[in-house]
């Protein structure tokens, strides 16, 4: 095999691994440990609490797809460590009963409460919401928190 073909093969393999890493990891490990709404979930130097989950059919033109509803998850993330903690709303994913994983939904339904990306100093916490869209009355949903896709730290909260 020529050097050029080996390089292309290596790049493609790396893209496949990185691109599918979080979904593969979550489907393999997400059900091992599951917390409930209101539980404090500790992951290394941080903690997460899902404070509440509400449903909404939207407002005005900001509505879910037909047959779906918005789930508004209010959560608190705290930095218990000695250095800064970066956080991102894309670290949170919803897993349904079929094992399908979805990221947050772009909507204005949660307004100023929406969790954005940011940095927490030691001892600081942030409370905000993320919104997802699921079929009305969906059961057995889980929130997976993946603070770093390159490490094996995953927290799962039953919704």
Task: State each model region's role.
Residues 2-159:
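Conserved functional micro-motifs across diverse proteins
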